[in-house]
Curated annotation (Swiss-Prot):
It comes from the Eukaryota. Residues 2-50 form the F-box domain. Residues 344-394 form the FBD domain. Transmembrane segments: none annotated. Signal peptide: none annotated. This is Putative FBD-associated F-box protein At5g56390. It comes from Arabidopsis thaliana (Mouse-ear cress).
Amino acid sequence: MDKISQLHDELLLGILSLLPNAKDVVATMVLSKRWRYLWMMVPSLVYDDSYQDIDYGRFSRFVDRSLALHKAPVIDTLHFKLGHICGSGDTLIGAAEKCCVRKLIIKIDDTSSRSSKTDQVILPMSLCSGVHIMLADLKLQNVVLVDVSTPVSFPSLKRLRLKSVKYPGNEFVNNLISSCPVLEDLVVKQCSDDNVTILTVRVPSLKRLSLIQRAELEIDVPHDFVIDTPSLEHLKIVDYTYGSRVVKSTMNRIITASMDVFSPQTKEILGSLTSTKRLFLCLPTSKDAYPVGNIFGSLIHLTICTCETEWLNVLIRVLRDSPNLKTLKIEQYHNLRDEDPRPCWNETSLVPEYLLPSLETFEWVDYEGTKTEKQVVAFILRIASCLKQATIVSFKYIDHDKKLEMLNDFPVSSRRSPACMLAFSWNL
């Protein structure tokens, strides 16, 4: 301990910041005179109530007292991890308001044995009143926001993550998001009964956006998106609810986009992604996937998921409209549904020979060597005149004999590009 005590304050504070609980940080004050006041300057604090058998009142008093004694001019990260809540989060927010916090995390640990679906933090709207002038990063998970007359304002917030949050209604959450004038990164994961049917994201400064809707949302209730983000560069949409759709979108600077959706209503959103350079698609159908005549002229990297029945039609359609594509990856990202039929290859009706004039890299992950898969690989090797590298990674649950059979049946002679290097590997 004497040797550790001789270290510089900055190094010791960094070590204390790694402790899993603020209670452990405060406890170091009894080690020696050297440590007595050191904890008061720790830049990152985690208040973890998720595993302790203490009542919430005792926990909240500890939060209030320890933060009142804290002397650091700025707290880089203040994290409240809660397993059971009685009452509201007024004490937590009140204590946090006494400090200059850059990053604030408030969440219930739903894996805790003491937590339940009814245990949720009700946060006062003083959190959104602009008192946190320095707050640049905010994450809320499994909490309830209540509506009051306090104006919503986050003047310095650049990153906002809202996961399984319940709101007073559409207007409230839309105002909350639009009240962040310098916001650059937004993640919204909706939950059932969140009181939001139309999520509007209207932020001129936003650069990254992730919208997530899981299957537990009510299917018969519409869940729509309105996206007005002229500076957006990175978009991710995960939607397993079948009925959701983007009703309006303004995105002119997209660089990367990921669309993993069950809903066939993708025409509006994909029609706005013509500037993207990297695109991931897992779509249920190619019909009306995006407007006829759209060209992905900037697209250089395409990844297609093979879990849906019509993945092959989606692939061919996008290839037709991507004249500058350089990298193509095919992979099964989700489990197959046994009742769904698999696609069949029909080269004469599906594909013209002028596809893939710029393709240089081709990769297929979870390749099983089916008849259709072999036909698709052979076609790509035959028409990709600039191909430099083709990599096939086998499905990991295939036995050794089947892998050897796949290797022997691989269409090596189909290569049109003499410079193409073939690699066949096993997915372990």
